[in-house]
Amino acid sequence: MNLWVSIFLVSAIAGSCLPSGFAYVDVCNHEFEVFRSVIEQKCPRSLYPSPPIEVDGDLLDKLMDANHGNAYISILFYTSRCPFSRAVRPKFDVLSSMFPHITHLIVEQSQALPSVFSRYGIHSLPSILMVNQTMKMRYHGPKDLASLIQFYKETTGLKPVQYMDEGEPTSLDTDGNLITWLHNGSSIREIAEREPYMVLALMFLSLKLAILIFPIMGSRLKTLWALYVPHLSLGILGETSQLFGRALHMIDVRRLWIKLRLTKTRNFQERAKNALASVSLGKSSSQSA
């Protein structure tokens, strides 16, 4: 029964707009145009979310030159070889849906010359640059979604049309957190094979830190050497001289003892010779008598 009622109502509405007269057709068209204009005012086409556009250096310059109005353009400079850059890419896609008023462009490092990055003041990746006709604002801060939304709101004065959560996978391939890798049981060798550029970057940072620390440590060690080592040297030399003097004294005592023994031995030998001589003289005198 409900099905027949629905069919009857649809037929009645369609019959009201049949070309029984040109006036009825004009009324239907006019009502449709009014309805469409109201819908477009509430949901203009410019607010429909669109994904970020991947461009190279030449196309980026052309789009920037063609931006004569006060429209904002957000540009993500990143490299696909770095896990930290790959982690920012999904967040940038979310931002393009939350802020459809803003044109979002993506520039990959291999698609642009180094002069393009220098022209826009990009010296590290990933970097997000907000541009309009009068200003260029580079984002400095954490790369989480809440901080990026706050940067968009403060820079452009616009509010997001919807709030979205970061529904990004946190696997080893997409998450660039070294601590997470180590926590999940990956060895240093596996990380080096998977991300050699990150290992080289860490080695470079360690070398730079060592270059900064070693001169300071060297100056401190020199100061400690100048303050304490001379006193230690004098004390060691004094003790050494005392030990050397005692050793010499012991050597002199030993020499005296040897001389004394030699003297006693000589005296004993002389006395023995004298005794033998007196005995031999006594025997010779008795024989002559």
Swiss-Prot record:
Domain Thioredoxin residue range list: 37-157
SUPFAM superfamilies documented for this protein: Thioredoxin-like
Keyword Hydrolase: no
Keywords: Glycoprotein, Membrane, Signal, Transmembrane, Transmembrane helix
Regions crossing the membrane: 198-218
Superkingdom of this protein's organism: Eukaryota
Keyword Signal attached: yes
Signal peptide: 1-23
Sugar-bearing residue positions: 132, 184
Membrane-protein topology: Single-pass membrane protein
Subcellular location: Membrane
Cellular-component GO terms for this entry: membrane
Gene3D superfamilies linked to this entry: Glutaredoxin
PANTHER family xref list: 5'-ADENYLYLSULFATE REDUCTASE-LIKE 7 (PTHR47126:SF10)
Protein name per Swiss-Prot or TrEMBL: 5'-adenylylsulfate reductase-like 7
Source species taxonomy: Eukaryota, Viridiplantae, Streptophyta, Embryophyta, Tracheophyta
Gene label: APRL7
